[in-house]
Amino acid sequence: MAQENTQVNAGVQGKIVQCIGAVVDVEFPRDQMPKVYDALKLEGSPLTLEVQQQLGDGVVRTIALGSSDGLRRGLMVSNTGNPITVPVGKATLGRIMDVLGSPIDERGPVSQELTASIHRKAPAYDELSPSQELLETGIKVIDLVCPFAKGGKVGLFGGAGVGKTVNMMELINNIAKAHSGLSVFAGVGERTREGNDFYHEMADSGVVNLEKLEDSKVAMVYGQMNEPPGNRLRVALTGLTIAESFRDEGRDVLFFVDNIYRYTLAGTEVSALLGRMPSAVGYQPTLAEEMGRLQERITSTKVGSITSIQAVYVPADDLTDPSPATTFAHLDSTVVLSRDIASLGIYPAVDPLDSTSRQLDPQVVGEEHYQVARGVQGTLQRYKELRDIIAILGMDELAPEDKLAVARARKIQRFLSQPFHVAEVFTGSPGKYVPLAETIRGFKMIVAGECDHLPEQAFYMVGTIDEAFEKAKKVA
């Protein structure tokens, strides 16, 4: 029945009756109104409109997926009869596309041989496949305290300027380059410069093969922050559709989203433009439903897996804000970046007490890893509790065992720092990839007291524990 409708309504023409910013009302014959989410094309223009509401009397309310400059009442619009469809499959590899799947890298058109609608249902419950396999990142603090699962969902939470994008770039560097599968990067409402830097970095490392694009390992979809809200709202779905198509071919896919908060923000803008009543803190009333619809599609099936890493901006460093709070519920691992840790000069500024992972379970990571991680967290928690006493009375008033706990905690804190490959330009020190076994060995030695004789500065910005011993000799 839906197919018949599509055939009847495709090609039907309507005319613009109202245009307020990105919201455009179009009037169609009453018996041939487009369906919600149908894509409409403006005559003589590349602009696409997406139907959001049916107002009655043949009028539909749409969101413009592009600039609405120059629109006026009376312009003719035709119904495509289908939702927005984008190219998928091998043709997208090595390319940069916009929300509609059009190329923006000046390397010719993208083949439309395989296309898919950006609006799809999440896989059925019986198709899903849980994963217990760990994904090693080479970043000590993440591998130890909040390990990632292959086929899991990870969130990088942080306020402005604490290192979400740098952490994500390092994860891409460590995982995507060594990863045998494919990657999809969705830039949602972020800076154009970051998208440009990412593309050139991928080209330099060979992940994007400029000589033979189809041999590339990454597809990129960008809707940067100067785009209209409709583009920023849908660009995550475009990226996800490409990732789903690779997964359904039986591949293991890495799906990077930077930044999921901008997706929420675009939803807020669209909701306000459509005249919906705002909910808490001005967010759209459909916040949980919109987030759920996106996140439920990012999942692994029995055919292939999607491992997703999402940066989440935290407004005013408030993790209880409705947007990050709604995102938390969908994730397997949460990496929380802290401004307090960044202010100490410790990068990556991951808070080991706030970050969590469902994989940190002795049955998944093993007893040794679990005990070391909990030992590290216990020592850091004790230091946190003693800080007020130290501030008022000083270190001398502490009991001997507390002095020892503080000394070890400060060493752990510094050992959690690590030079990144992507930050070599800024730090001047070569990046370090630390295998999980080395990470566990190093922290086990500190917690057990085998490094009590070393100065704490020996642990700052090193890779393995052996490097800390080497650095201690130079310091001494």
From Swiss-Prot:
SUPFAM superfamilies: C-terminal domain of alpha and beta subunits of F1 ATP synthase, N-terminal domain of alpha and beta subunits of F1 ATP synthase, P-loop containing nucleoside triphosphate hydrolases. The keyword Iron does not apply. CDD domains: ATP-synt_F1_beta_C (cd18110), ATP-synt_F1_beta_N (cd18115), F1-ATPase_beta_CD (cd01133). It is an enzyme of class 7 (translocase). One of its GO terms (molecular function) is proton-transporting ATP synthase activity, rotational mechanism. It catalyses: ATP + H2O + 4 H(+)(in) = ADP + phosphate + 5 H(+)(out). ATP binds at G158, G159, A160, G161, V162, G163, K164, T165. The keyword Lipid metabolism does not apply. It is found in: Cell inner membrane. Keywords: ATP synthesis, ATP-binding, Cell inner membrane, Cell membrane, CF(1), Hydrogen ion transport, Ion transport, Membrane, Nucleotide-binding, Translocase, Transport. GO terms for cellular component: plasma membrane; proton-transporting ATP synthase complex. It comes from the Bacteria. Its EC number is 7.1.2.2. F-type ATPases have 2 components, CF(1) - the catalytic core - and CF(0) - the membrane proton channel. CF(1) has five subunits: alpha(3), beta(3), gamma(1), delta(1), epsilon(1). CF(0) has three main subunits: a(1), b(2) and c(9-12). The alpha and beta chains form an alternating ring which encloses part of the gamma chain. CF(1) is attached to CF(0) by a central stalk formed by the gamma and epsilon chains, while a peripheral stalk is formed by the delta and b chains. Produces ATP from ADP in the presence of a proton gradient across the membrane. The catalytic sites are hosted primarily by the beta subunits. Belongs to the ATPase alpha/beta chains family. This is ATP synthase subunit beta. It comes from Paracidovorax citrulli (strain AAC00-1).
